[in-house]
């Protein structure tokens, strides 16, 4: 807008029209752009101001993958966190089937950390935990609600073995944002540290699904990343089910 204002003030008379696009679905598939391209004429040239002033000379690679793990638990009914892949999750919700004493233990631990618990009509307890969201590329100062929930449930001591192991896996894989939990702690002079977040997850019908978003440095090798990630996932009982990669440029 400022560039066009400047050109107008200088008396510039363009030969072509200008259009502004305000997208609302960039982080979830860009369906709005697909709709526009289907119903309207596409511009001949576009400029996307998506970087801090004054200039960008590279972009980290973007690796997003899904992984699943079976969970055998009579205690942990459901566990869900996150609304988009490229964001440290702000909220997490879990439902547990517990005894009265176990419910009291969970409430004590969760409420001491600022979370809340609600008794449900079917006798289960629903747990809510809040984190501090941030973009996957800039996770500094954030707090993952998924990791926070996992840590609190493990600390309460009410989970059975497999559910407790899952909570340990979550904390180990996503407790830091710089690749250590997935055995990919890479960095370079040109683009800095690799970052990774567990953006979304859901436990449903005995299967835990996890989405992971990684921004990897420009000198990292995709094949090495995938090899280390796959080994780490397997060690925690996960199977890689789908992966999408956008190579870095520099």
Q: Whereabouts are the PLM-identified features?
A:
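Acidic/histidine-rich catalytic neighborhood of metal-dependent amide-processing enzymes
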Residues: 1-72, 101, 107, 111, ...
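Metal-dependent amide/peptide-bond hydrolase catalytic core
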Residues: 64, 70-250
């Amino acid at each position: 807008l400022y560039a066009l204002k400047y050109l107008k003030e200088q008396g510039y008379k363009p030969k072509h029209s200008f259009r502004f696009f305000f997208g609302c679905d960039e982080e979830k598939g860009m369906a709005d752009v697909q709709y526009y391209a289907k119903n309207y004429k596409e511009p001949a040239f576009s400029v996307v101001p998506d970087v801090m002033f004054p200039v960008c000379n590279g972009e980290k690679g973007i690796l997003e993958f899904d992984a699943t793990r079976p969970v055998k638990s009579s205690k942990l009914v459901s566990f869900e966190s996150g609304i988009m892949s490229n964001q440290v999750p702000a909220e997490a919700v879990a439902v547990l089937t517990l005894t009265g004493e176990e419910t009291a233990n969970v409430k004590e631990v969760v409420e001491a950390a600022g979370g809340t618990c609600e008794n449900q009509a079917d006798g289960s307890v629903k747990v809510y935990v809040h984190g501090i969201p941030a973009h996957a590329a800039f996770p500094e100062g954030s707090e993952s609600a998924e990791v926070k929930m996992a840590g609190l449930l493990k600390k309460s001591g009410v989970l059975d073995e497999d559910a407790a192991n899952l909570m340990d896996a979550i904390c180990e894989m996503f407790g830091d944002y710089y690749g250590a939990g997935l055995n990919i702690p890479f960095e370079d002079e040109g683009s800095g540290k690799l970052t990774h977040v567990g953006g979304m997850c859901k436990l449903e019908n005995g299967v835990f699904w996890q989405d992971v978003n990684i921004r990897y440095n420009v000198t990292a090798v995709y094949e090495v990343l995938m090899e280390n990630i796959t080994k780490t996932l397997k060690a925690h009982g996960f199977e890689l089910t789908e992966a999408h990669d956008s190579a870095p440029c520099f």
